[in-house]
Swiss-Prot record:
<dbReference type="InterPro" id="IPR042185">
    <property type="entry name" value="Serpin_sf_2"/>
</dbReference>
<dbReference type="InterPro" id="IPR023796">
    <property type="entry name" value="Serpin_dom"/>
</dbReference>
<keyword id="KW-0011">Acute phase</keyword>
<dbReference type="InterPro" id="IPR042178">
    <property type="entry name" value="Serpin_sf_1"/>
</dbReference>
<comment type="similarity">
    <text>Belongs to the serpin family.</text>
</comment>
<feature type="glycosylation site" description="N-linked (GlcNAc...) asparagine">
    <location>
        <position position="106"/>
    </location>
</feature>
<dbReference type="GO" id="GO:0005615">
    <property type="term" value="C:extracellular space"/>
</dbReference>
<keyword id="KW-0325">Glycoprotein</keyword>
<dbReference type="InterPro" id="IPR036186">
    <property type="entry name" value="Serpin_sf"/>
</dbReference>
<feature type="glycosylation site" description="N-linked (GlcNAc...) asparagine">
    <location>
        <position position="271"/>
    </location>
</feature>
<comment type="function">
    <text>Although its physiological function is unclear, it can inhibit neutrophil cathepsin G and mast cell chymase, both of which can convert angiotensin-1 to the active angiotensin-2.</text>
</comment>
<dbReference type="InterPro" id="IPR023795">
    <property type="entry name" value="Serpin_CS"/>
</dbReference>
<comment type="subunit">
    <text>Interacts with DNAJC1.</text>
</comment>
<feature type="glycosylation site" description="N-linked (GlcNAc...) asparagine">
    <location>
        <position position="186"/>
    </location>
</feature>
<dbReference type="InterPro" id="IPR000215">
    <property type="entry name" value="Serpin_fam"/>
</dbReference>
<protein>
    <recommendedName>
        <fullName>Alpha-1-antichymotrypsin</fullName>
    </recommendedName>
</protein>
<keyword id="KW-0732">Signal</keyword>
Length: 423
């Protein structure tokens, strides 16, 4: 009979919001200046990371949609993957392999060191200051006061993931919960509140990842043009929503006849853009089934600047919270949640097991721009109606929205908007 050891719970929390203020991390990722050789090597690794993260993002999206097909979806795949990569710093053997392969890394082509290096470089890139775009991403550890962590883990957590560390009294669960929730609320400018609802009585450590994004449209909508209009939930059912509009704009556009959808890219000031995918009526499931890295690449490669006479987009604010344990099991990350978990790289002992993975995201889309946080899937719907010689695009039925920083090509947020009035 297997002897059961007392296990200590470890929580993994992910939060995200997208506002227009640039956050400056309190803890720099690396004080040293990277050499040209490291930069060149990092570029190669970063391209691989972007491709891998897109694969993970769409795999995760499909699982989230299966869980609640009739609800809005918003999450930050990059925030979730970063949190799991951060966790893998302390994992060994099968636990480590499952986490990294679950993130869609090919471990015969990419070493563990290269994976962490690419996340380090990505965090450094995303946290660079800009007057036009506010984007910050960071990590933190909340550690039971009596728990002793390995120096190597602490050093790598700070060097590679810029993690802050906070001594926490988890015996006082109310105070610990407030400490963590206040931290996340502060880092997301008040947009993510009450990330933690409950703490396991055996919790000894909580890892947190947050992302904050706020950007202004390169071509903003005029609030005076916003009016109440129908958003179709189905052919016969609709809700009235505030509908923003733009007239006579030239922007990247692609009509995908193969998948029966229209793709429009709206750019933010700074290095980011939002990709809106509007399936034809009753074609959403077909488009979702083909959400693959190669599909996204084909869309982006096919975009061409086109004059759009009228574009209509709903103004909305949506949020979702997810417990990701069961979904991660479907993606092959299993052992970390069981008594077989090997997270001995954190404390030196095999007495830690992941008890919960919580993700919460908020997305606001309005006339001036977009706000979103941490694990956020951006939802904006696109509907195309062509009236020769005019091009009119109406996001007045369910659509997808993807926010991408142009300098990394990783997916910050993915959103599916089923109902703009569904908070």
């Amino acid at each position: 009979m297997e002897r059961m050891l007392p296990f200590l719970a470890l929580g993994l929390l992910v939060a995200g919001f997208c506002p227009a203020v640039l956050c400056h991390p309190n803890c720099p990722l690396d004080e040293e200046n990277p050499t040209q050789e490291n930069q060149d090597r990092g570029t190669h690794v970063d391209l691989g990371l972007a491709s891998t993260n897109v694969d993970f993002a769409f795999s995760l999206y499909k699982q989230l949609v299966l869980k609640a097909p009739d609800k809005n979806v918003i999450f930050s795949p990059l925030s979730i993957s970063t949190a799991l990569a951060f966790l893998s710093l302390g994992a060994h053997n099968t636990t480590l392999t499952e986490i990294l392969t679950g993130l869609r890394f090919n471990l015969t082509e990419t070493s563990e060191a290269e994976i962490h290096q690419s996340f380090q470089h990505l965090l450094r890139t995303l946290n660079q200051s800009s007057d036009e775009l506010q984007l910050s991403m960071g990590n933190a550890m909340f550690v039971e006061e009596q728990l002793s962590l390995l120096d190597r883990f602490m050093e790598d957590a700070k060097r590679l993931y810029g993690s802050e560390a906070f001594a926490t009294d988890f015996q006082d669960s109310a105070a610990a919960k407030k400490l963590i929730n206040d931290y996340v609320k502060n880092r997301t400018r008040g947009k993510i509140t009450d990330l933690i609802k409950d703490l396991d009585s055996q919790t000894m450590m909580v890892l947190v990842n947050y992302i904050f994004f706020k950007a202004k449209w390169k071509m903003p909508f005029d609030p005076q043009d916003t009016h109440q209009s129908r958003f179709y939930l189905s052919k016969k059912k609709w809700v009235m929503v505030p509908m923003m509009s733009l007239h006579h704009l030239t922007t990247p556009y692609f009509r995908d006849e193969e998948l029966s959808c229209t793709v429009v890219e709206l750019k933010y000031t700074g290095n980011a853009s939002a990709l809106f995918i509007l399936p034809d009526q009753d074609k959403m499931e077909e488009v979702e089934a083909m959400l693959l890295p190669e599909t996204l690449k084909r869309w982006r490669d096919s975009l061409e600047f086109r004059r759009i006479d009228e574009l209509y987009l709903p103004k909305f604010s949506i949020s979702r919270a997810f417990n990701l344990e069961n979904i991660l099991l479907q993606l092959g990350i299993v052992e970390a949640f069981t008594s077989k978990a090997d997270l001995s790289g954190i404390t030196g002992a095999r007495n830690l097991v992941v008890s919960q993975v919580v993700h919460k995201a908020v997305l606001d889309v309005f006339e001036e721009g977009t706000e979103a946080s941490a694990a956020t899937a951006v939802k904006i719907t696109l509907l195309s109606a062509l009236v020769d010689p005019m091009t009119i695009v109406r996001f007045n039925r369910p659509f997808l929205m993807i926010i991408v920083p142009t300098d990394t090509q990783n997916l910050l947020f993915i959103s599916k908007v089923i109902n703009p009035k569904q908070a």
